[in-house]
Amino acid sequence: NLQRISYEEMLVNYFMILLIHLHRLTLQKPRKKNLQNMNEMEQAAQYFRMHYNKAISIENYAASHNMSISWFIQNFRQYANTTPAQYIQSLRVTNAKMLLETTDYNITEISNLVGYENPLYFSRFFRKQCGMSPSQFRKQLVLNTASQSK
């Protein structure tokens, strides 16, 4: 009878160990999925960094990578703390600032180089983001450079 009890206890213990292992496995799967999601979002961000100056359709990007648009936007927002569209706009404005600072291209040329088809829309968006027009931004850079060289 004592052997039977210890045999039953042993079975219960093995069963508990099995449950613990299964529980640990279920906890690990989301991590792998999260890592995969992070890799997918990093690839998306890299794609946007390389192609920000072209017309990018978030819907087409998501569909071509077998993602629903809502899932893609939600996961990208978790990855980058911004939506894909805002991320692309930010890349465009950042690169426009660099071009305004380092080139003599006019506003229309810069607008086209950073992916805007409409220079007026570009100027309005730039003003909204930076608090001044692209022309004012460039003039401010010239004034700052002149005052620093004195």
Describe each region flagged by the PLM.
Residues 70, 120, 135:
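Key DNA-contact positions within bacterial/archaeal DNA-binding proteins
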Residues 2-12, 19-54, 59-65, 78-86, ...:
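Short, Lys/Arg-enriched, Trp-marked, Pro/Gly-tolerant hinge/linker segments that flank
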Residues 64-65, 114-115, 126:
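Core residues of bacterial helix-turn-helix
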Residues 46, 50, 55, 59, ...:
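Terminal helix-turn-helix DNA-binding modules in bacterial transcription factors
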